[in-house]
Amino acid sequence: MSPTGHISKSKTPTPHDNDNNSISDERETWSGKVDFLLSVIGFAVDLANVWRFPYLCYKNGGGAFLVPYGIMLVVGGIPLFYMELALGQHNRKGAITCWGRLVPLFKGIGYAVVLIAFYVDFYYNVIIAWSLRFFFASFTNSLPWTSCNNIWNTPNCRPFESQNASRVPVIGNYSDLYAMGNQSLLYNETYMNGSSLDTSAVGHVEGFQSAASEYFNRYILELNRSEGIHDLGAIKWDMALCLLIVYLICYFSLWKGISTSGKVVWFTALFPYAVLLILLIRGLTLPGSFLGIQYYLTPNFSAIYKAEVWVDAATQVFFSLGPGFGVLLAYASYNKYHNNVYKDALLTSFINSATSFIAGFVIFSVLGYMAHTLGVRIEDVATEGPGLVFVVYPAAIATMPASTFWALIFFMMLLTLGLDSSFGGSEAIITALSDEFPKIKRNRELFVAGLFSLYFVVGLASCTQGGFYFFHLLDRYAAGYSILVAVFFEAIAVSWIYGTNRFSEDIRDMIGFPPGRYWQVCWRFVAPIFLLFITVYGLIGYEPLTYADYVYPSWANALGWCIAGSSVVMIPAVAIFKLLSTPGSLRQRFTILTTPWRDQQSMAMVLNGVTTEVTVVRLTDTETAKEPVDV
């Protein structure tokens, strides 16, 4: 650190854990501000922005849904997003070390969020592998999901042209199939109430199946060869190869840290916007497109009086922004200390929400075209999730001139949307463990190779003929209630134990002005209520897991709850361990374990007769500090 308080790329003053005696360390920082912004945007903007938000907006009152969505975004989503970015930038460590320094009693929060990210990465990359498989399949003059004369097709298969000729709505009533309260996250959005990732029923009505539906379910997934989660069947080696390619891409993007991933995201984060723009222009030129957009945006303000609409809005906001996975904290820890994290939080949150809104025009312009072509209602083709991007949208693309081109860029968009979100989840784990265990940091390349090898081996279960059942189980339980509980404890630890006043001073020290009263009220009161609201409503509506007509056995649901509980239990388990291993009376132990690491170091130095500026780990230059500004 220079005399003026400037932080160089090579050396960043920062406090360490108790097992480290120095107060500064070598920490890599982003080579440019844009690298950080693109990484955060790439993580937050993922598949759910394309397949989830537009349908929610349509289902919950059209344009009126923007009212509860905007309120939940402002009072719950952005404050939590801002909080986690600020924590990461100020403490300059991954989740485990950060929480160990902030509130030692709640160090288990760090372990919990790392374990949640670990579970999610087991299955999230399978979605990317599906996208890659479709991408490879698109290199043909005739897209394979357009006809019914393939070996995987059944006599009930109907191509799109036959559907149009007979006016049979074989796409099916998707809104019925996907009538859910809280929907699929698939990394940034997770099932909360037993709703189904049903793709086998998509495209199925009155005994008929669309060609696109049979291609996905009978060829890509081969679900017809499995009876359930107890019958995974053989590994599909084409999918296993695609999954391997995905992990190789992830490895060579992350093995050197942010120096490599920060450059890769220039493509993976920006390419989807180019494709969305192209698809938007193309969609608006299709017949019937404005009918779809009308359904998407026409406001029905009576909908906002329904509790489930507000739950949908809150759930979408929370899981779309993605606090609690440790990703925001990890990415921000590589910022320069005086970076304006407040501006970054507002900018990236706005871009994330705007992307979701624009994606709605891309999706519903094509759904309007499908409804117009098939002679059915929008309700009969409007859906979300895998059924939208792997069945409905591909079927529509196949009818356009130059369909191969449209298919290639669409699935490349899905691939890149998934990849940079996967980068974030993996980096959260790597950074947290590297900061807590220095040996891992010194052998990062080997550790990342081992981590992705483990992911691949476990991911093979999702590449089997019954792998979708395993995938669906993880999607339901890996990061639903557990992430909500973890972030609830984050909000409590920061606001009520560490203290919003102290946290505000930390932010003032970084950016020159403290957060205003509004942010403090949100952190202290609104955010915890926001999280409890989502959690309690989800628990009330909980139903055992199903998929189409298949009901998961009791042992599968029990396994799912064990997975969910294994991460959350780290919070009390680590707290109990800390209480038992800390000397002193019970009251003294609580005092020590709720005292931030910096204060403990300050007290230790004062007791040793040493009083020095280094006892308070702040980086503000008093001569250049800015005056407080209320925001």
Swiss-Prot record:
<keyword id="KW-1133">Transmembrane helix</keyword>
<comment type="function">
    <text>Sodium-dependent dopamine transporter which terminates the action of dopamine by its high affinity sodium-dependent reuptake into presynaptic terminals. Also transports tyramine and norepinephrine, shows less efficient transport of octopamine and does not transport serotonin. Plays a role in the regulation of the rest/activity cycle.</text>
</comment>
<feature type="binding site">
    <location>
        <position position="49"/>
    </location>
    <ligand>
        <name>Na(+) 2</name>
    </ligand>
</feature>
<feature type="transmembrane region" description="Helical; Name=2">
    <location>
        <begin position="64"/>
        <end position="87"/>
    </location>
</feature>
<dbReference type="InterPro" id="IPR037272">
    <property type="entry name" value="SNS_sf"/>
</dbReference>
<feature type="topological domain" description="Cytoplasmic">
    <location>
        <begin position="572"/>
        <end position="631"/>
    </location>
</feature>
<feature type="glycosylation site" description="N-linked (GlcNAc...) asparagine">
    <location>
        <position position="300"/>
    </location>
</feature>
<feature type="topological domain" description="Cytoplasmic">
    <location>
        <begin position="335"/>
        <end position="340"/>
    </location>
</feature>
<keyword id="KW-0812">Transmembrane</keyword>
<dbReference type="GO" id="GO:0042734">
    <property type="term" value="C:presynaptic membrane"/>
</dbReference>
<feature type="glycosylation site" description="N-linked (GlcNAc...) asparagine">
    <location>
        <position position="188"/>
    </location>
</feature>
<feature type="topological domain" description="Cytoplasmic">
    <location>
        <begin position="1"/>
        <end position="33"/>
    </location>
</feature>
<feature type="binding site">
    <location>
        <position position="421"/>
    </location>
    <ligand>
        <name>Na(+) 1</name>
    </ligand>
</feature>
<dbReference type="GO" id="GO:0046872">
    <property type="term" value="F:metal ion binding"/>
</dbReference>
<feature type="glycosylation site" description="N-linked (GlcNAc...) asparagine">
    <location>
        <position position="193"/>
    </location>
</feature>
<feature type="transmembrane region" description="Helical; Name=12">
    <location>
        <begin position="551"/>
        <end position="571"/>
    </location>
</feature>
<dbReference type="GO" id="GO:0008344">
    <property type="term" value="P:adult locomotory behavior"/>
</dbReference>
<feature type="transmembrane region" description="Helical; Name=4">
    <location>
        <begin position="236"/>
        <end position="256"/>
    </location>
</feature>
<feature type="glycosylation site" description="N-linked (GlcNAc...) asparagine">
    <location>
        <position position="182"/>
    </location>
</feature>
<feature type="binding site">
    <location>
        <position position="44"/>
    </location>
    <ligand>
        <name>Na(+) 2</name>
    </ligand>
</feature>
<dbReference type="GO" id="GO:0015872">
    <property type="term" value="P:dopamine transport"/>
</dbReference>
<feature type="transmembrane region" description="Helical; Name=5">
    <location>
        <begin position="260"/>
        <end position="284"/>
    </location>
</feature>
<dbReference type="GO" id="GO:0051583">
    <property type="term" value="P:dopamine uptake involved in synaptic transmission"/>
</dbReference>
<feature type="topological domain" description="Extracellular">
    <location>
        <begin position="139"/>
        <end position="235"/>
    </location>
</feature>
<dbReference type="GO" id="GO:1990834">
    <property type="term" value="P:response to odorant"/>
</dbReference>
<feature type="topological domain" description="Cytoplasmic">
    <location>
        <begin position="431"/>
        <end position="445"/>
    </location>
</feature>
<dbReference type="InterPro" id="IPR000175">
    <property type="entry name" value="Na/ntran_symport"/>
</dbReference>
<protein>
    <recommendedName>
        <fullName>Sodium-dependent dopamine transporter</fullName>
    </recommendedName>
</protein>
<feature type="binding site">
    <location>
        <position position="46"/>
    </location>
    <ligand>
        <name>substrate</name>
    </ligand>
</feature>
<dbReference type="GO" id="GO:0019811">
    <property type="term" value="F:cocaine binding"/>
</dbReference>
<feature type="transmembrane region" description="Helical; Name=8">
    <location>
        <begin position="405"/>
        <end position="430"/>
    </location>
</feature>
<dbReference type="GO" id="GO:0042745">
    <property type="term" value="P:circadian sleep/wake cycle"/>
</dbReference>
<dbReference type="GO" id="GO:0015874">
    <property type="term" value="P:norepinephrine transport"/>
</dbReference>
<feature type="glycosylation site" description="N-linked (GlcNAc...) asparagine">
    <location>
        <position position="164"/>
    </location>
</feature>
<keyword id="KW-0915">Sodium</keyword>
<dbReference type="GO" id="GO:0030424">
    <property type="term" value="C:axon"/>
</dbReference>
<feature type="topological domain" description="Extracellular">
    <location>
        <begin position="60"/>
        <end position="63"/>
    </location>
</feature>
<feature type="binding site">
    <location>
        <position position="420"/>
    </location>
    <ligand>
        <name>Na(+) 1</name>
    </ligand>
</feature>
<keyword id="KW-0532">Neurotransmitter transport</keyword>
<feature type="compositionally biased region" description="Polar residues">
    <location>
        <begin position="1"/>
        <end position="13"/>
    </location>
</feature>
<feature type="transmembrane region" description="Helical; Name=3">
    <location>
        <begin position="108"/>
        <end position="138"/>
    </location>
</feature>
<dbReference type="GO" id="GO:0099509">
    <property type="term" value="P:regulation of presynaptic cytosolic calcium ion concentration"/>
</dbReference>
